[in-house]
């Protein structure tokens, strides 16, 4: 299965089958095990990754850089200031040039169309490190974390409470393909994109999953195995922050919300978190929080993607 992924792009989990996603999860578990035992597996010795960042990041940058190093490879960080792409060079030219230098390209940017165009013209695998539409590398770390703490994915009830953003788009696709019940609670007007809803529902039908959309966060949280949230205002939405705070007041993951979930529910957040807004400090630091395990798993999920594709 993993051999079939060699040379592939990782733009969205919609492009990956259930078995392929499971294979990546299994590889991440294996690589994490080696790391914990202090065993160095230089699977990517001599390989180089170019990392294009038009959006700043802590976890994505450090986890991919550390991941390449741990697998014996090298990562080059390229900000907007480092690239001619920001000065008018077409994405197609950048893709062709970088393909002559490196073995893979990671890009974190705003428009999904930029990632798709980069992949179209690149001769090496392109990895989507985040766009306004998708966050597929985060989603892989998320399902890895659920497997670690719950032992299974099929039938898991995940309640995402908050903004219908790129994170939940990728969670819906991953959950649908893996047979999970993904409940999404947003205020009216903040729902996931219609195309993502339809796509995810189709994937759910094919794989025994379920996608449920509601406006009542308590309805979503009732009996859930996983409570998941993200910031209410994403990067680029700073001007909307105050309005969003008002609109999302009832969507905070707090002790009362946690009481509605299953007694053994886990709490997840992709970070960075605004404590006291979408999640309380008490819940984030509480015994049911796996937020920092989830953050750690970015490293191992990303290593699995790199090892499989490069």
Regions found by a protein language model. Name each.
Residues 54-66, 150-229:
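Glycine-rich phosphate/diphosphate-binding loop of Rossmann-like nucleotide-binding domains
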Residues 202-282:
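Rossmann-like adenosine-cofactor binding region
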Residues 264-265, 271-310:
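Adenosine-phosphate binding glycine-rich loop
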Residues 71, 101, 121-123, 178, ...:
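Short, structured coil segments at secondary-structure junctions
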Residues 96, 103-174, 269:
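Anion-binding alpha/beta catalytic cores of soluble intermediary-metabolism enzymes, centered on
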Residues 1-62, 66:
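Positively charged, low-complexity intrinsically disordered leader regions
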Residues 48-101:
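Active-site cofactor/substrate anionic-group-binding motifs, chiefly glycine-
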């Amino acid at each position: 299965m993993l051999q079939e992924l060699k040379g592939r792009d990782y733009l969205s989990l919609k492009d990956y089958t259930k078995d392929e996603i499971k294979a990546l999860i299994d590889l991440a578990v294996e690589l994490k095990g080696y790391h914990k035992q202090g065993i160095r597996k230089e699977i990517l010795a001599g390989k180089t990754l170019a990392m294009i960042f038009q959006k700043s990041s802590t976890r994505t940058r450090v986890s991919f850089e550390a991941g390449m190093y741990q697998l014996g490879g090298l990562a080059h960080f390229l900000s907007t200031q480092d690239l001619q792409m920001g000065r008018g060079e077409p994405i197609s030219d950048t893709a062709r040039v970088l393909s002559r230098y490196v073995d893979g390209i990671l890009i974190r940017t705003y428009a999904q169309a930029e990632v798709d165009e980069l992949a179209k013209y690149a001769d090496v695998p392109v990895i989507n490190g985040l766009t306004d539409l998708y966050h597929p590398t985060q989603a892989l770390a998320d399902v890895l974390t659920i497997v670690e703490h719950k032992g299974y994915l099929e039938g898991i009830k995940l309640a995402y409470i908050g903004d219908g953003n790129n994170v939940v788009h990728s969670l819906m696709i991953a959950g649908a393909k893996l047979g999970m019940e993904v409940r999404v609670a947003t205020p009216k007007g903040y729902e996931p994109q219609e195309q993502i809803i339809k796509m995810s529902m189709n994937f759910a039908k094919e794989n025994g999953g379920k996608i449920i959309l509601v406006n009542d966060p308590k309805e979503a949280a009732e009996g859930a195995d996983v409570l998941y949230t993200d910031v209410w205002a994403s990067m680029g939405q700073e001007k909307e922050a105050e309005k969003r705070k008002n609109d999302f007041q009832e969507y905070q993951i707090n002790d009362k919300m946690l009481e509605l979930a299953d007694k053994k529910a886990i709490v997840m957040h992709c970070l960075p978190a605004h404590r006291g807004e979408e999640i309380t400090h008490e819940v984030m630091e509480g015994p049911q929080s796996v937020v920092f395990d989830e953050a750690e798993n970015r490293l191992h999920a990303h290593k699995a993607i790199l090892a499989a594709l490069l």
